[in-house]
Amino acid sequence: LNVLADMYGTDKIIPATVEFVDVAGLVAGASQGEGLGNKFLANIRECDAICHVVRAFESSTILRADGATKTDPKSDIEVINTELMLADIATIENHLPKVTKELKSDPKLRSTIDYLTSLQSQLLSGDIPDSFDDEKLHGLDLLTAKPIIYLFNVDENGLTDQTQQAELARIVINTNSAGDVVPARLQQDGNGASDKPRNDGRTERSQESLSPAGYPQVVFICAELESQLRELSVIEATELLADYGVTESGLAKLAHAAYDILGLQSYLTAGPKEVRAWTI
């Protein structure tokens, strides 16, 4: 955009945007009304995708929802996923009688009933499917069917600690995939996917690009560093990122992940009045 603005001699630059809505935190038992309960779940239901911010740094002054100071990303992720699954199980349970009633007039609904029953059983076993049959969901808008980004909030060292990042990525894969998946080598700066053949003929991708085949996106960000970057010029921010061994801000990584997981892309228009990026 800046290059086009220079070419056309305009100062008006309108970038593409992705809107993130900050909803209240989720606690265990939300599906039964604990905490903000149904209000939280309703807020998620209105979103196109879920971005789960997971604390992955140690601090003696920051408490988890259960009052503990020790960081436990695996437990935090399991709490969220469990509540989403329980909410979806209840949704399917409430919907099945309606579909069953309609079966008399529409025998084709038998496959839908079988699918929903199987899906409910899978969720009851604690397994989130890698893919969903949207046609058979009948507009249920299940929470577990939404694409998800796991945003791990790490400390400064975590931005380049490939061992820590690989461990965190394994938590996500083990939590969401029914298959035996081993993460590929992590891209140090997260600037793109690194495809790698698997023994079963499928393709692995780097930890920060796990959206294919139902896998989530994984992004590592240091919120403390991001707050510093907001106060700096572009040149100063670039220099600070270089000091930490990364080439892209966490905010930029998150935007790219959101575009990828939602299947969005941008096209540009330019002229003497403005340069604009459009989202499609």
Language model regions located:
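Flexible beta-alpha connector loops of hexameric P-loop NTPases
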Residues: 26-32, 69, 80-84, 103-107, ...
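C-terminal-of-GTPase-core extension/linker across diverse P-loop GTPases
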Residues: 98-176, 186, 195-196, 201-280
